[in-house]
Amino acid sequence: MSDEIIVVSTPYLPGHKITKTLGFTWGLIVRSRGLGRNITAGLRSLAGGEIHEYTQLLNQSRQEALDRLKEHAATMGANAVIGVSFDSSETGGVMTEVLAYGTAVVVEPETGAASPVRLG
């Protein structure tokens, strides 16, 4: 059911009207980088450039946080989440926290003329 949740970073959903605002929704994950990744990344950082192990870990964490956000929104009865943002922080030097958050809403397609794009 969470696969059907529409997720956007904008405060509105073009072509849809918000019929109900359900409130704040989020998805959180905390992951340990692990000793092996820390050693590999530490060696790679000596040469400079991108640390692929951490990039992969953060991409996976962002996706998991987004999946959890959608699951939480679905339990609230939402079919969309607007204003989605991400935040991340490091905890204890070995763990990374990724938070996805937004506003759970119920939307329905607008009928008639196309909606103007609102900026700002």
UniProtKB/Swiss-Prot annotation:
InterPro entries: UPF0145_dom_sf, UPF0145_YbjQ-like. It comes from the Archaea. Pfam families: YbjQ_1 (PF01906). Transmembrane segments: none annotated. Belongs to the UPF0145 family. This is UPF0145 protein Mboo_1021. It comes from Methanoregula boonei (strain DSM 21154 / JCM 14090 / 6A8). The lineage of its organism: Archaea, Methanobacteriati, Methanobacteriota, Stenosarchaea group, Methanomicrobia.
